[in-house]
């Protein structure tokens, strides 16, 4: 079996990690008396478990589809002979017998609660043991939290009064922001979901104000997000919401100061060690917090969510914010999607009665809902896009899978939506590069004028802001996004081609695109606490040897790992928004294409969206949803 897997590694179907994990299992079992087909099956499943995990699946359902398409070989006509060879080496054992065949094998456990092994079987699926353990820990946390806190510390009337203060607007239709705050007051674990502009951070700001009032401003609260960029956006949103409420609702000085206005990354909060799996804060040394707010939860993978849960005291109130319609985490798992799937169920009768008493809104109640439903609230009304917004309608059509209708919208909203059809890949690169040159011309002209007039970037212009800030605002008004990293239409090639085209137009001057040059935009790709730069931060080189991040300048020799940012991936854009977004899709079908990817790219745009894509590829992507295999939903179903 190893010889076949080695060939698949040479063909780059399997990674080095996939192959060497399988080899480890082979070495461990070499002196055992397992039958040869069983040994081969164990080696196969080790490679398969690793391969599936790196694709984002926390487990692999042992079904006929998996059996007939091992490692995706069924769709590779030149490599399909390897599939036949694999089945021969496991003695043509059918998939429904795989688990029984490995009963008692040293590398597998059928009872992961009581027995540890590298891999585990559960619910007819194959797991890495650590992935099963992470899912189990999350569900146990939710189960214990729901059971432990069934009594409210405050009366319905007290909660009602606070909600009326912070939601003075009278609405006939249900104000889901108000419902979300009431839900999170009652439950020490809550999830607030919603699309872009639905007011998740505004809602959580009101929630924190209510909680601090109820607890006499004594709560220790922290704000976190998965990336530095997302943390900055959370800070900005909280500050804006607080400023508005202080002005409109007479928030006291002490209450205002009781709400944190600084956010950190999850890695920073937990003290994650970059070289191993250890975190400073864990079950033995929990975070000393009363309330933790986590934004952009869709970006959090399974292992990180398990680490977070593990570091909380039982009495800490956890509030998760996110949009399950966006892309799931880069690494394995789709935690928010699994947790939020129960939002379509009605609330329990008990929760419905509580919401009626505290918010005045009547919601549907049921005896059959999953207990986690009472912890969830989904916000539906977008404040970013009005009812006549083309971007708003397009995002709605994409979310509903209306591929054909979505294309028609580009004709109905020509001022807001632009679709450029792509066919030939070479021509597509030229089209995208030409568009980038035109869109970046303005900020580079501003920078050139600054250079010619020998003006310090930190000097103030006529509007009272620094020239550095004005140039960055112009640069950030448009953002080019692409679906891929390695491809002619991928981020690496397009960044290079755009830089060369700008030099050809005499808008940039450099010898090598890898050099530091004035006008070069960069994106930080790893956190560096010493210089306070974080993954996702965007900077501009505005003077020799200096890069500006907002009003802060950093010497180029202190910049951590980074990459050019004329173009960035849609994945990296999560948590950001731009006045004009330009999105590029590949000209051929690619596994990365999905409805979630397109939705994420489209909803980065605030005022204008330009798309470069083949019409068939656009439709295919919208019809393709991400289906990551996980056992979290199955474990949650058993909460009843």
Swiss-Prot record:
Alphabetical keyword list: ATP-binding, DNA damage, DNA repair, DNA-binding, Exonuclease, Helicase, Hydrolase, Isomerase, Nuclease, Nucleotide-binding
A single GO molecular function term of this UniProt record: ATP hydrolysis activity
Residues annotated as binding ATP: 194-201
Reactions that this protein is recorded to catalyse: Couples ATP hydrolysis with the unwinding of duplex DNA at the replication fork by translocating in the 5'-3' direction. This creates two antiparallel DNA single strands (ssDNA). The leading ssDNA polymer is the template for DNA polymerase III holoenzyme which synthesizes a continuous strand; ATP + H2O = ADP + phosphate + H(+)
Sequence intervals crossing the membrane: none
Biological process annotations from GO: double-strand break repair via homologous recombination
Pfam hit, one: RecD_N
Superkingdom of origin organism: Bacteria
Documented EC number(s): 5.6.2.3
Gene Ontology CC annotation, any one: exodeoxyribonuclease V complex
NCBIfam families cross-referenced by the UniProt entry: recD
Family under the similarity heading: Belongs to the RecD family.
Record text on subunit structure and interactions: Heterotrimer of RecB, RecC and RecD. All subunits contribute to DNA-binding.
Note: In the RecBCD complex, RecB has a slow 3'-5' helicase, an exonuclease activity and loads RecA onto ssDNA, RecD has a fast 5'-3' helicase activity, while RecC stimulates the ATPase and processivity of the RecB helicase and contributes to recognition of the Chi site.
Its job: A helicase/nuclease that prepares dsDNA breaks (DSB) for recombinational DNA repair. Binds to DSBs and unwinds DNA via a highly rapid and processive ATP-dependent bidirectional helicase activity. Unwinds dsDNA until it encounters a Chi (crossover hotspot instigator) sequence from the 3' direction. Cuts ssDNA a few nucleotides 3' to the Chi site. The properties and activities of the enzyme are changed at Chi. The Chi-altered holoenzyme produces a long 3'-ssDNA overhang and facilitates RecA-binding to the ssDNA for homologous DNA recombination and repair.
This protein's name: RecBCD enzyme subunit RecD
Organism: Haemophilus influenzae (strain ATCC 51907 / DSM 11121 / KW20 / Rd)
């Amino acid at each position: 079996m190893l010889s076949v897997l080695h060939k698949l590694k040479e063909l780059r179907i399997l990674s080095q990690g996939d192959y060497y994990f399988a080899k480890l299992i082979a070495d461990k079992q070499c002196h055992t008396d397992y039958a040869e087909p069983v040994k081969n099956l164990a080696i196969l499943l080790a490679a398969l478990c690793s391969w599936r995990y790196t694709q984002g699946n926390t487990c692999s359902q042992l079904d006929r589809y998996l059996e007939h398409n091992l490692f995706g070989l069924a769709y590779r006509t030149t490599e399909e002979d390897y599939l036949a060879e694999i089945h021969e080496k496991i003695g043509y054992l059918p998939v429904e017998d795989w688990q029984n065949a490995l009963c008692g094998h040293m590398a597998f456990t059928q009872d992961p609660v009581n027995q540890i092994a590298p891999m585990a079987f559960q619910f007819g699926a194959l797991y890495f043991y650590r992935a099963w353990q992470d899912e189990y820990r999350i569900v146990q946390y939710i189960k214990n939290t729901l059971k432990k806190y069934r009594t409210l510390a405050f009366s319905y009337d007290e909660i009602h009064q606070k909600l009326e203060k912070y939601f003075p607007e009278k609405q006939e239709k249900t104000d889901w922001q108000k419902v979300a705050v009431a839900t999170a007051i009652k439950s020490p674990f809550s999830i607030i979901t919603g699309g872009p502009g639905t007011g998740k951070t505004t809602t959580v700001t009101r929630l924190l104000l209510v909680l601090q009032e109820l607890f006499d401003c004594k709560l220790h609260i922290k704000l976190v997000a998965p990336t530095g960029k997302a943390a900055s956006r959370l800070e900005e949103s909280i500050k804006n919401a607080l400023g508005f409420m202080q002005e409109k609702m007479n928030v006291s000085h002490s209450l205002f100061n009781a709400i944190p206005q600084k956010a950190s990354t999850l890695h920073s909060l937990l003290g994650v060690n970059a070289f191993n799996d250890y975190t400073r804060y864990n079950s033995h040394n929990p975070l000393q917090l009363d309330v933790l707010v986590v934004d952009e939860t869709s970006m959090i993978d399974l292992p990180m969510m398990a680490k977070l849960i593990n570091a909380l005291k039982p009495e800490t109130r956890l509030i998760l914010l996110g949009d399950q319609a966006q892309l799931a985490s880069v690494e394995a798992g789709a935690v928010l999607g699994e947790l939020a799937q129960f939002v379509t169920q009605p609330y329990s009768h008990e929760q419905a009665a509580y919401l009626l008493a505290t918010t005045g809104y009547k919601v549907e109640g049921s005896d059959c809902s999953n207990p986690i439903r009472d912890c969830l609230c989904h916000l539906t009304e977008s404040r970013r896009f009005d009812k006549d917004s083309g971007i708003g309608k397009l995002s709605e059509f994409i979310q509903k899978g209306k591929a054909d209708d979505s294309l028609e919208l580009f004709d109905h909203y020509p001022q807001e939506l632009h679709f450029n059809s792509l066919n030939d890949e070479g021509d597509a690169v030229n089209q995208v590069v030409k568009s980038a040159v035109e869109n970046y011309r303005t900020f580079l002209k501003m920078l050139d004028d600054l250079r010619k007039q020998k003006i310090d970037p930190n000097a103030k212009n006529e509007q009272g802001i620094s020239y550095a800030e004005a140039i960055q605002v112009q640069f950030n008004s448009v953002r080019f996004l692409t679906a891929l990293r390695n491809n002619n239409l991928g981020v690496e090639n397009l960044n290079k081609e755009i830089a060369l085209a700008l030099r050809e137009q005499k808008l940039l001057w450099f010898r090598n695109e890898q050099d530091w040059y004035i006008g070069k935009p960069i994106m930080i790709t790893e956190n560096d606490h010493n210089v306070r730069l974080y993954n996702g931060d965007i900077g501009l080189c505005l003077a020799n040897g200096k890069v500006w991040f907002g009003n802060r300048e950093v010497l180029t020799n202190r910049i951590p790992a980074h990459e050019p940012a004329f173009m960035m991936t849609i994945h990296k854009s999560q948590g950001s928004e731009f006045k004009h977004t330009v999105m590029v899709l590949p000209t051929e079908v690619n596994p990365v294409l999905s409805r979630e990817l397109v939705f994420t790219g489209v909803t980065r745009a605030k005022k204008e969206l330009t798309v470069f894509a083949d019409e068939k590829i656009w439709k295919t992507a919208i019809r393709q949803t991400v289906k990551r295999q996980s056992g979290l939903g199955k474990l949650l179903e058993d909460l009843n």
